[in-house]
Amino acid sequence: MIGALARKIFGSANDRRVKGYQARVDAINAMEPEIAALSDEALKARTAEFKQQLASGKTLDDILVPAFATVREAAKRTLGQRHFDVQLIGGMVLHEGDIAEMKTGEGKTLVATLAVYLNALTGRGVHVVTVNDYLAKRDAEWMSQVYSFLGLTTGIIIHGLDDPERQAAYACDITYGTNNEFGFDYLRDNMKYRLEDMVQRDHVFAIVDEVDSILIDEARTPLIISGPLDDRSEFYNTIDTFIPKLEPADYEIDEKQRTVTLTEGGMEKLEQMLREAGLLKGESLYDIENVSVVHHVNQALRAHRLFTRDKDYIVRDGEVVIIDEFTGRMMPGRRYSEGLHQALEAKEHQPVQPENQTLASITFQNYFRMYEKLGGMTGTAATEADEFFDIYKLEVLEIPTNLPIARLDEDDEVYRSSREKYAAILAEIERANGRMQPVLVGTASIEKSEVLADFLKEHGYKQIDFANPKSMAKLYDAARAGKPSKLFAVLNARFHEQEAYIVAEAGVPGAITIATNMAGRGTDIKLGGSLEMRAAAATAGIEDEAEKQKIVEGIKADIEKFKEMVLAAEETVELEPGKPGGKTIKKPGGLYIIGSERHESRRIDNQLRGRAGRQGDPGRTKFYLSLDDDLMRIFGSDRLEGMLQRLGLKEGEAIIHPWINKALEKAQQKVEARNFDIRKNLLKYDDVQNDQRKVIFEQRIDLMRDQNVSETVTDMRHTLIEGLVAKHIPEHAYPEQWDVSGLREELQRVIGLDLPVEDWAKEEGIADEEMLSRLQQRVDEHMAAKSAQWGPEVMRYVEKTILLQTLDHLWREHLIMLDHLRQVIGLRGYGQRDPLQEYKSEAFELFESLISHMREAVTAQLMRVEIVPPDEQPPMPAMEAHKLDPNTGEDQVAQAQSGLAPVAPAKRDPANPATWGKVGRNEDCPCGSGRKFKHCHGRYA
């Protein structure tokens, strides 16, 4: 109460900071007449002036006011748009490396130009990050008009570009692209063998659009470059046949934690089935030799009992395609990890694709923390302000709207069953449609959007495709006639290709759009419809400019009339029904948002609400809930149901009370807090791998930068031999205690030389230092002979290539070991040990082991390496890019050919390991010993 009173008197911290920008806003406005008087040439010349001032020692803050004034004028001349004062404040927030929360329709894309231009003047590059290729391309093409007018270059990074195209885009002053593409380019760059092949520059300044989606929703999503493993499709299919035979009593499901576990009876039943199939070793399912079987059983159980077709995934063209839980979009190419996707393919009787091995990975949390300065924009960040600051050190500033918000947010209506809820939604749609008010219904999944669509069809509504001109003609004709069309469109993962068009036309009078969550985010819904979208569709293929202009003018007139109709679609509600002359209230027209259930996160609900009431337009929002909804069922529906019964609620009646909204908000806050804790805890683990990744990647770049790595290779060789001598000839030991034969055998195994160490050991008075010196000298002579044979230039190339290839190979193996360690480390908690500290300690030991193996493997390969003619080399294998989500186990694969893998010679010489190329761990060793590779040369390579 005291805090609320203080805020009334002094204003909130947010208000005070916004006021702090006013002086600079006034200064920019004061410059406007002077800047407006400049010719185009003089305005363009200001860019060179600003660069000169920076070179003379001025800072970006020193030139902010004139630079912002310049961008505002350039936008007026190129786009016909002038930055509002609140947009100038947004630009300052972005420049300072914080998050600007700006409501839908407030022009975030235009705001970015201010901070982008100012920071691009340094010449070090600015990255603008969006959530998909469509938005990256749209925003880059749109805003590049401003940048090119002012003499700056703009590049776009989208899927499908080759390396030279990417290098050109990154070399530009400003680069637009998606979060996935920026992250994958970073990983691919750190798998290359020449500096000139790398595409990215330094990570200096990035502005992230829809920052909450990228840095919160997808924060735990690792980007992964991977290669294929052995095919185990039949094993997945076999395990899958057992799961349908289990009954509900055989397993327990925890919906909150999203886990499923076998009961004692279920375990016994499954063990019996596995034993009969010959798949169970030992007595119990949980014996050590059955680890792989347990893993496959657990994934098959999850696939059958936790994942629902048409909600979590759909089956299309013989593939299991994941549905994004946040947007409802279909994610082609994305795959669940750890064998879960293969389990789903087996469940749906689709071809089971092989699993992949991780070659390189990074999370968005760690990728975006590499930037020297990071800013973000979104319509909904305030609810996650603590997380943004805690993890990214980003403050969230709520930017005031240019015009007051005229949207009515009504209290939720809660029904006892989903059937009653859908009936109420249908009745509300019919009322809104009768007065020509456009309606957007938000659903949580494809499954629920299609349930609602079927419900509408049963009551005489017809589904159309808003992206189909003929379908739209019917809607426009009905709108012109002022008659309800009873037509509706569904925007979900199945129809995502045209989502921008469908969303843009959701503001046409009488339009009914059903959308999963925030599909189509990034596209404004304009009342009356979108002139740009309609004009582009209507004039496609028409060459005659006069005819085009005539069509566009007709569309303009349509939209003006349509907007008036939508604004007039108010609803008069009687507060005292049946009473003559009773009180009434008017509810606004504009876009009507209906939420069909609450999401776990308040932010997602706020995003849906934010679709209505853009730029001061009127609008309405209302959520319809039932006790069957996921959030209600998991958090306290039993209590609510008892209360509804006590109130004597009849079928079809709803309870409407602000208390319900507050109770739901508290439930959502609990979920948000839990998810934040999960993300924060996972980041602590990921930071361990991230610190090691930075060391490895920096080492790679240093190696690529060095013209001559002979000194590094020699140090490795000498350190390795020192270790071998210390192992077999302990310090202060008598010569008769030396393990000379063991030293000789290990030298032969590791470096491939049979040296007379036994003869040396018999010499009178020889010490361990002398033994070490002779060994190092002989090995150095061997390498010097190779260098003389090939020439110093070839030798330098071979040394660098082997160093990089060995580092990459060991790093990949290290990633697998870290992943396995992370999966089991939680069990240490049962022994009263801190799993995180245990993970840090053991991960460090593994890293030290990697460095040790690096010395051994590099030395071994260089001692044996032979030059192979280029024409004997096979084509390079392809790699794939993946994106995992620890929330759901998703593995998002953006099919990418990399061609960065080291090439193996075509023929294997048993005496020359350098010719063996990649050898499977379970293959027979190419040396001819008859043992498996992992038990022979694979122990150290």
Curated annotation (Swiss-Prot):
Keywords: ATP-binding, Cell inner membrane, Cell membrane, Cytoplasm, Membrane, Metal-binding, Nucleotide-binding, Protein transport, Translocase, Translocation, Transport, Zinc
GO MF assignments: ATP binding; metal ion binding; protein-exporting ATPase activity
Reaction(s) catalysed (UniProt annotation): ATP + H2O + cellular proteinSide 1 = ADP + phosphate + cellular proteinSide 2
GO BP term, pick one: protein targeting
Protein's UniProt keywords contain Acetylation: no
Chain sites annotated for binding ATP: 87, 105-109, 524
Enzyme class of the recorded protein, top EC level: translocase
Pfam families: P-loop_SecA (PF21090), SEC-C (PF02810), SecA_DEAD (PF07517), SecA_PP_bind (PF01043), SecA_SW (PF07516)
Chief place where the protein resides: membrane
Sequence positions that bind Zn(2+): 925, 927, 936-937
InterPro entries the UniProt entry points to: Helicase_ATP-bd, P-loop_NTPase, SEC_C_motif, SecA, SecA_CS, SecA_DEAD, SecA_motor_DEAD, SecA_preprotein_X-link_dom
Gene3D superfamilies the record matches: Helical scaffold and wing domains of SecA, P-loop containing nucleotide triphosphate hydrolases, SecA, preprotein cross-linking domain
Domain of life of the source: Bacteria
Cofactor(s) this protein requires: Zn(2+)
Localization of this protein: Cell inner membrane; Cytoplasm
Protein task: Part of the Sec protein translocase complex. Interacts with the SecYEG preprotein conducting channel. Has a central role in coupling the hydrolysis of ATP to the transfer of proteins into and across the cell membrane, serving both as a receptor for the preprotein-SecB complex and as an ATP-driven molecular motor driving the stepwise translocation of polypeptide chains across the membrane.
Similarity remark: Belongs to the SecA family.
Protein name, UniProt field: Protein translocase subunit SecA
Organism lineage: Bacteria, Pseudomonadati, Pseudomonadota, Alphaproteobacteria, Hyphomicrobiales
Originating gene: secA
